[in-house]
Amino acid sequence: MLKSVAPYIGKYKKYTVIASVLTTLGIIANVAPYFFLYQLILPLTRHQLPDFHFVVVRVLLIFACLAFYAISYTTGLCFSHVSAYNTLKNIRISLKSKLENQPLGNIKEMGTGQIKRVFTDDIDQIELLLAHAIPEGIANLLVPLIVIIAMFIVDWRLALLTLAIIPVGVFAMSMMMKAGMSKMGAYYESAKKMNNTIIEYVNGMEAIKVFNKDGDSFRRFGDAVRGYRDFTLAWYKVCWPWMAVYNSTLPCLAFFTLPIGALLVLNGTIDLSQLLLVLCMSFSIGSSILRALSFGGKIPQLDYKIAELEKMMNGDAIKQGTHGFEGKNYDIEFKDVKFSYKKSAVVEPVETTNEEKSAVVSTSSTTVYSEVLHGINLTLKQGTTTALIGESGSGKSTLAKLLVHFYDLDSGSIKIGGQDITDMSIEALNNQISYVAQEQFLFNTSLYENILIGRPTATREEVLDAAHRAQCDEFLARFPKGIDTMAGDSGKQLSGGERQRISLARAILKNAPVIVLDEATAFMDPENEEKMNAAIAEIVKDKTVIVIAHRLSSIKNADKICVLKAGNVIAEGTHEELMKNCEEFQKLWAASTQAAEWRI
């Protein structure tokens, strides 16, 4: 487990070492007062009054040790937390990079809830290992070990009596861990379902209210939360008895020592001073042993969380090379492209006990593949505009997403200027393509910074010019802060059409040689669509353009139109050629024309 986390500690490893040393010194200082207490009690057992100076010195030493313990232990934890949170930062940055290099399908399959849980909750749990389990665990095991050796030096019989209760506590802890581990996977599946359901419920609030689905949606939400509650309570019901046993036995190391030791004193086998010293030692380390072993109870959970983290970290990275763009031009070639979407099919649920009936049951799943593109062959010449049309589900958007390398192909190749896109780094490929999708995400920052994403090195004047060319001036004038207005969560401050114009401004600013417009005018009213088309016409000059549209009137003048049906290209040509020779295009054109003429 620690081996998995160690690469991310980096230069902060020394902080963990310092923390371990300081906490160990702190625990020693916390144990020492019991020895001074023994020195104060010892004269009384011999019917003697200790010297006043002797008492004052011991009392001052006790306070000094407690003060040193507080300072040393707290300082040690400060060092360990600096190390821990910098390590968590490194893990999150690494996870972000790994996710960026994974196919979009893998990320969607995980779900927002699971990704959020791993990024926040699971990684936060590693803080327990780095900030507490390592420095405190070492200190709370090392110091008791030294004290136990000292006990054997005082009297081996009393030492064995002191240790006799520990196996009971360790056995109880092992049973608790065994019971917990048997349900660990199902517990986290229950938590994952609850997280995803909560996020779905919040994100779908608008649709829930519009279609009066409060009851159905809240029922699913409530079932997920209750399932998590019931499973957690059932899990803890199994663990609680064992937890109570080890929590009550481990601190009581004098359980056998006190009665049997007293008999040994009465029999004259040992001296009372020996018993008192061993009792003081046992009182001093009971809490330390409990603290050290308590981390053991949390290790299985950490193991599972780190395994989940590693699974996400080690997901299949998207295929990419290390070269920059080396193409001789910006012709695009799709050659024998086949692609399947990966789906998880749930198989039979695993039987559960009666206690878990209301909770989420454990399931097994298998991966199935649904081929959506079947040997696509297309050539798009530099400086031309190619439109992809077809019914919903025909593969238009999938083809565009494959060009920007959101997914890996099953087979075939996609080349730009003769260079396979898998030969380039993702960064190099992204520099060649501007992708404007139907649904554009805006970050909760200013509109200026959202446009600046297109080219981070651009000047403010260039950003303002891009916004102007994307027809953003009209709605920016409504805001007191203009382009510096905050976009809101997911761009909720703007309408759908306004968000698309901001995304188009990004593309204008980026000025890439290849442009993909995936339903870029889908949310536009006729007036704004005309403005957008004018802006698009300006930026696509001398560029290789792919347009995906349902409104066929908008792509009538495209250099080439490709008709897709059920994952195949069934025809390609100009508008006039397809109107003469392609029955499928004629049907699509008639449907589009009829839709445009529809009135209430």
Model-identified regions with their sequence ranges:
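Transmembrane helices of ABC transporter permease
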Residues: 11, 15-28, 69, 135-186, ...
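Transmembrane helix-loop-helix hairpins at lipid-water interfaces of multipass membrane proteins
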Residues: 16-72, 153-157, 272
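Juxtamembrane helix-loop junctions of ABC transporter transmembrane domains
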Residues: 29-38, 65-112, 116, 120, ...
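Cytosolic ends of transmembrane helices, especially the final helix of ABC transmembrane type-1 domains
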Residues: 213, 284-312
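ABC-type nucleotide-binding domain
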Residues: 328-600
